[in-house]
Amino acid sequence: MPFILQHMDSQTREWLDYQADLIEALLASHKIEALVTGVQVSPRWVRFVLQLGLSTKINSIQNLSEEIALALGVPSVRLARTSSALALEVPLPNPQPVYLLALLRDVPPLLPPVTAVLGLSIDGEPFTLPLMAPEVTHVLIAGVTGCGKTELLRTLILSLALYNRQAHLQVALIDPKRRGFAPLAGLPHLLAPIANTQAEARELLAYVVSEMERRDREDAPPTPRIIVAVDEVSDLLARGDKEIEQALIRLAQRGREAGFHLLCSTQRPSADAVPGALKANLPARLVGKVASGQEALTAAGIPNTGAEVLMGNGDFVAVLGAQVTRFQAAYTGAADIRRILARLEAASRGGSAAVPPSPNAETYSALRDRPADADSDLS
């Protein structure tokens, strides 16, 4: 059952019926043959599944996007293809936040190694990212200020730490703005203190690259997996430090087999901010709201993702090869971060993962069943 349907009131159901009727009437007024045959509801948007007539062209509906949004009384709509139909995604009037700790109730306690929990997909299921999959490996997170890039990075890192022991996974954090990763300073999985300055970033990357080369040279096993996360990589590269640039490129080009994963966020994914040799080796793209269709193409690497009509505040599309999945990023507020870090610290003293392979284990249930932050928001 989709995430929100179990809590849906009669007013929301009436709104859905009314919107479906409006969509069909508007399309019919333009002589477009289409019926609403299904509805999927997520915390922030609803997907109306359209069955098109044989002669109906998708572009004819795409060209009416603004008119449809105006008729429905919403800021924008997004078109997405399903396996057998077309879907029209519409913002909900009363969106609900998604919190990581609450979401963990629906996540299997035994995930594949180095798999991150990102949020909730459009079909109401937890959306995960297996970093060891060849089409993932390294990740670029892009979008305008306020779209939720840093919050998504934090959630990604915390979920990895919850499901992987320190012996199997370590994290290197680079934070040129000195704000994004500060709440994670107590993470037991940290390989080194958070690098905030240019010199600290250069030193940390030099060590990571040397470890990658040692593993290559000695044919050493790729463990522990090392996650290198950079918040606002364009700021880090803005000073033209070639050592840092080359270290990031080498990690992206050669890190996979040695057990390294590079995660970079940026609000400027253009070639002048993120070198082509680096971006080309970050195959997985998590794209939040961007300013235009051209910027969506630049960030995602493929056309027609609809990132320019996303709503911000954690509304993302994941681009994995040719597959595009819309999801709402899970939010982790300050109080929840403290709870998670305390659980991770306790688990590290016992030499275990904070989420053990049993849904009935105390360490799992005690963490997941705590209430989310009362004062959390999505800003």
Where do the PLM segments sit?
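P-loop NTPase catalytic phosphate-binding loop
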Residues: 1-5, 10, 22-38, 43-49, ...
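Pro/Ser/Thr/Gly-rich intrinsically disordered low-complexity regions
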Residues: 89, 93-95
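Charged, low-complexity intrinsically disordered tails
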Residues: 329-359
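Terminal-proximal interaction/regulatory segments of ATP-powered molecular machines
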Residues: 362-379
